[in-house]
Amino acid sequence: MRIAEIKRTTAETDIALKLNLDGKGVSVVSTGCGFLDHMLTLFSKHGRFDLELTCKGDTYVDDHHTVEDVGIALGQAFSQALGDKKGICRYGDTTLAMDESLILTAVDISGRACLGYALQIPTQKVGTFDTELTEEFFLGFVRNANLTLHIRQLAGSNSHHIIEGTFKSFGRSMKKAVAIDAAFANEIPSTKGVL
């Protein structure tokens, strides 16, 4: 079973997370940031990952620490659940339409943390959510999952649609990348022999 449990406590956040890579897309998410909860529920559904996540953060300041630290914890969970990465497809990409927005994400579970982020979100907020925190979430994730993620906005004018399309596309790309490839069932998918 490719399952991880993460408990992460700092002076700013207290996070408990359980992730099943081979799930059915069932999630229970409570971070204190409603928009982030919505995005993670979409990610779980489209990636078919089971996700249980609670975060108690200093949202009386703002949502920055919560969003960043949830990204960190989710990245740690993927790293833990993937183990030695034997048999994974390694790569995944998805171009996804969300009304007028069109988002491409591409993943390489390479063991190297790299984020290529090219969203042009037109507003500073969606409801109470600071849209600049979208990038902070993904930075926290890639640095702790040790993978490469490229995000490209090919079209879009509605901030909510752009971010929602990104999380849906990201979920589907991660689903492809972590899937087991029968051709590599007992191998690391790299000529180096390690990821």
Map each language-model feature to its residues:
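Structural preference for solvent-exposed beta-strand-turn elements
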Residues: 1-195
